[in-house]
Amino acid sequence: ERVSDAIYILQNDLGISFDNNTCFGLYVHISCLIERLVKQNTLEDEIYFNETSEEFQKFQTHFKQSFSVVEHYYSVDIPIHEVKYVYDYVKRA
């Protein structure tokens, strides 16, 4: 429920609407991500990136605000490379 609420908030903050497939894909990915973070099963090779665009910075700010309740509830911090994955996923949708 918290993940779907956060996705809804993110859409509102960005002023866009994701289609059902995108929402479902984000829900599954973020739910699995949270499970990995809670169990402290991180990926062995975290993806390195150098994204400094203003568009990504804006997305990152909105993402962190939208998912702050999720991070607080599960006591996790969603890593920047995961935010970048979601950013790329949404851009391709």
Identify what each model region corresponds to:
Residues 1-93:
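A cross-family "folded-core" feature that marks the main globular domain of proteins
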